[in-house]
Amino acid sequence: MKHVLIFSFLLAILWNPVTSHAQLISQTQRNQTTQVLDIVYLKSKTLRSEYLKVESELWKPLHESRVASGEMTAWFLFEVTYPYGSNRDYDFVAINIFPGTESLKNQSLEGTRAMFKKLNPNVDTEAIFEKTDASRELVKGEVFTFIAGTTPLKLREPSDFMQVNFMRVPDVAAKYYESLEKQYALPLHSLRVKAGDMQNWSLLKRTLPLGVDYPYQYITMDEYANWEMLTKEPTPGLWEQAHDNLVEQEIWNKFIEVRDLVRQETWRLVSYVIKQDAMVRTRGR
């Protein structure tokens, strides 16, 4: 059945050439309301406290400056709680949220050096980079675009716990998958938020890098105020409130046909920088 759905979307895709990286960036630049997330996966090399000290003392002031200027919307730092163990690829995740792709041009080494110099002309950037490299390994970075959610990311503080679901979706079924999430999942999660079952839900699409070697194309983020909220039993009757007489299993079968859950991780919030009511707000180390 999955192949039938994919074939039907292939017919439509034939009339729409694949968007190149340059076209993608150009389109996003024309729509500056798009929320772009630069997600950075990090592996600490030192004690946890030593790594967090580097983030707090060397990098957080820079994030605060960029958020205050409007170049960056927010910065979040999460610690991976599940999976745990020495064999996991990364144990911290930083999320840089931008109002569009234009700000991504400053994510290079030279761009970062220039931003530090702008903040403090006398700063020794090489010493900062050396201390940073000694404290952690940058495993990989990916760029995602916010597709849908119960509350736009730029309008709220991050939750203390987040379950992150990595989804594999064929390119030819991408638009259909997004429509399923918006039509069925979003109304349900909105009711879950009102019922106190969760705090927020978001759907993100990976836009850079692209290619068949990457095992997932989408991420959904389920956010919870605390561990108790994450593990509580769901409030009964929410599906019926959201979708009346629709049979729940029949709808979820539509999801199963076009996407696979590659893996799920649990992240715990460590620190953040956001801008609310024209003020920069921070928490954590």
Give the label of every model feature segment:
Residues F7-N16:
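Bacterial N-terminal signal peptides
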Residues A22-F116, E126-R285:
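Short S/T/G/P-rich N-terminal loop/turn motif that feeds into the first structured element of a domain
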Residues K2, W15, D124-I128:
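Compositionally biased, low-complexity segments enriched in small residues
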Residues M1-V4, Q23:
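Positively charged n-region of N-terminal signal peptides that target proteins for export
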